[in-house]
Amino acid sequence: MGAGFLGREVAHQAGAGGWRVIPVVRTERSAEGLRQQFEETVATDATSSSFWAELQGQWSGLVWAMAPSRESVGGDFQTMHREGAVRAAQWARERRVAMVYLSSTSVYEEADGGWVDEGSALAQDERSAAMVYAEMETVRAGGSVLRCAGLYGGERELRDRAEGPERWLNVVHREDAARAVGVALRNQGQTFNVAENFPLRRGVAGGVWAEGSKRTRRSKRVSNAKLRNEGWAPIYRAGVKDSSHR
């Protein structure tokens, strides 16, 4: 459900692994770009109750990949997570289908550079609360959650220029994040952080964000130990070309 920057990579990896993949996207324009590889791509509103009431067939897994974006604001963001993801979780529970909800490490409250794991305190802002609610409903329904760090890879490159205050930045390559979905499908009822082994240091001493900037003020270091214990390891490392760090 959702085939954007990360969801599209999940679909590609699953298809390459021999799975029958049916991406569900919100617009016909998005669907057209996927149908060359996935002929059964569907363009519809997967947040609506009618979609889930009418969805039939035998399914081995469901991935909710309508990931947070800076373009998703207000009611649309809330609908995506508080309604759409929750309906997906309820549907998966009723049909005993393994589910993975793709969330974000932005849900953590830590702001002073400390380490966080899956049990760390969570933020209370509106966007974080919406994702955490969807996470809780997913796990309660028997599904699993992947809290992904900042994504890069392909057409999305990391910025090298120093800006803003000193802080820690947690990232993960799109291909590595997509590989974690298989781990989550095999380990239902769990929450995992998906991040590279080494957070990046960014910003400058005494730096500040420009007035009106929407960039996060939080600084944290995200532990991926739980996911690594299940056999996952990042192949890529930010800033290291053709890297393989296991």
Describe the residue ranges of each PLM region.
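C-terminal amphipathic/interface module of NAD(P)-dependent oxidoreductases
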Residues: 40-44, 214-246
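Alpha-helical substrate-binding/gating segment
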Residues: 153-154, 160, 167-192
